[in-house]
């Protein structure tokens, strides 16, 4: 059912509440637990937080839509294997870090950003619908009309007004166990620490690595190496590093 109707099985509530230090970046002073009201009848739950996000791929085309197979590692019912990393394991991002939500939802005038936008998601489902097949359909709200492919997120930012950091568990990194994209997934659409905010629609969206480290964010690659992706990385290169089978020629980064 809809994300807001999904609640923890009582047996697993202690696990949902658990704070796991290895899932938290020491440089992020954000909350380590969040409260969210879910289900019908509504109940309040506590979630342990998370800084490390698995990649759904480049975010280009329809590869932001984790309901279907993507050019990354993770999607609903994903069955990606190491042999599917045709771009090479050392050239493919598997996970990257993010900044946890600040636990304060706000509604602001269109085009206005909150004081710390990197701690919130721009909740931009207005003007979109699931449509058929991979990818969502736009009909307003700054989104292109028709299938949403490679959208101009600044146009979306200019129209949308809702910023989320915890409502219904819908904040960045508010849980490590609830499998919603804005909580546990990332993609390469936005470069590290981009001034374009992480933008979500219907539980999925357009994200990017974020950290409070100076100059960039860390990423885990398919070969197990951890490398620092600079804020200044070329956007095309960044997206290529997040795809596992795009056939791109990737130089030094």
Enumerate the language-model features and the residues they cover.
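Internal low-complexity, small-residue/proline-rich segments
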Residues: 1-253
């Amino acid at each position: 059912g809809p994300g807001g109707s999904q609640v923890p099985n009582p047996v697993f509530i202690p696990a949902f509440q658990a704070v796991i230090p290895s899932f938290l970046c020491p440089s992020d002073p954000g909350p380590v637990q969040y409260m969210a009201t879910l289900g019908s009848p509504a109940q309040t739950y506590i979630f342990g937080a998370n800084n490390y996000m698995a990649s759904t791929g480049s975010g280009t085309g329809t590869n932001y839509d984790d309901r279907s197979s993507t050019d990354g590692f993770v999607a609903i019912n994903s069955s990606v294997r190491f042999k599917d990393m045709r771009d090479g394991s050392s050239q493919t991002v598997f996970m990257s870090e993010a900044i946890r939500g600040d636990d304060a939802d706000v509604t602001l005038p269109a085009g206005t950003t909150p004081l710390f936008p990197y701690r919130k998601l721009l909740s931009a489902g207005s003007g979109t619908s699931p449509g058929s097949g991979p990818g969502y359909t736009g009909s307003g709200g700054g989104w292109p009309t028709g299938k949403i492919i490679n959208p101009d997120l600044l146009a979306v930012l200019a129209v949308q007004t809702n910023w989320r950091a915890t409502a219904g568990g819908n904040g960045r990194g508010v849980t490590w166990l609830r499998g919603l994209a804005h909580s546990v997934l990332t993609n390469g659409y936005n470069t590290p620490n981009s001034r374009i905010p992480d933008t979500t629609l219907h539980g999925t969206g357009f994200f990017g690595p974020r950290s409070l480290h100076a100059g960039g964010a860390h990423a885990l690659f398919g070969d197990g190496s951890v490398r620092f992706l600079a804020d200044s990385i070329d956007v095309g290169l960044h997206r290529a590093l997040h795809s596992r089978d795009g056939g791109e020629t990737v130089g030094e980064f």
